[in-house]
Regions:
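Acidic/His-rich, divalent-metal-binding segments that scaffold phosphate/diphosphate chemistry
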Residues: 2-84
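Conserved active-site and cofactor/substrate-binding residues in soluble primary-metabolism enzymes
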Residues: 23, 43-47, 87, 123, ...
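A generic alpha-helix surface/boundary motif
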Residues: 26, 46-50, 89-91, 119-122, ...
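Divalent metal-dependent catalytic cores for phosphoryl transfer on phosphate-bearing substrates
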Residues: 63-165
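C-terminal binding/interaction regions
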Residues: 155-156, 162-190
Length: 202
């Protein structure tokens, strides 16, 4: 098997002593505005952050502080993609480590593409960012070609598009299958959750 394309070369991130050390949402959004000129990419990260937070609160019974971890991981997972595609993930990880950010947040970001970064999702937060990353973008692409956008969107339509290789061809169906196979929820349920929770994100 070939090495991951953007292999990070390690599986441990941050310092355990920094557990629960989190940036504010305001600081995270400021970082996005500075690092990510592309408005569509910023929207993608905001959508993943919102869906991550909603899942933590509604499905995992997380408290607000834990939900913030989930949201921050989603919000920042692609922060270095636009300016540093050849070092994607490495730059944002090293930056967050320099700020002494909670290692759970950093590991979650590092594990959002195991095939690319060589870091396996370890816990439910890691697994859900892997699930939500590709599916969130795919569902938003589907919304953009609909006159009513998210209104009236249903799971059946998304499932049909997933079986159409020419639609949003850059989205890896193999990654989606792998990601969903790591959790105990069916794909259809995840799709409905994303539709319900990211449609209001601007």
């Amino acid at each position: 098997m070939s090495s991951p394309i953007l292999a990070l070369g390690r599986s441990s991130f941050g310092d355990p002593a920094n557990k629960d050390n989190l940036p504010t949402l305001e600081a995270a959004h400021a970082l996005l505005n500075e690092w990510v000129p592309n408005e569509r990419l910023r929207l993608h990260m905001k959508q993943v952050g919102a869906v991550m937070k909603a899942w933590a609160l509604e499905r995992e019974g997380a408290d607000e502080r834990t939900a913030l971890k989930w949201e921050l991981a989603g919000l920042l997972h692609d922060a270095d993609w636009e300016k540093h595609p050849e070092s994607h993930c490495r730059v944002i990880i090293e930056y967050l480590e320099s700020l002494n950010v909670d290692p759970e947040v950093i590991h979650c970001i590092a594990s959002h593409g195991p095939k690319y970064f060589g870091v396996e999702p370890e816990n439910i937060m890691d697994k859900m960012i892997y699930v939500f990353d590709e599916l969130s973008g795919f569902i938003h692409a589907s919304a953009l070609i609909r006159p009513t956008r998210y209104e009236g969107m249903d799971v059946k339509g998304i499932m049909k598009k997933l079986k159409t290789p020419s639609f949003a061809a850059q989205v890896s169906r193999d990654d989606i299958t792998d990601a969903v196979g790591r959790i105990e929820y069916p794909l259809e349920e995840i799709i409905q959750f994303i539709i319900d929770h990211q449609k209001e994100v601007q």
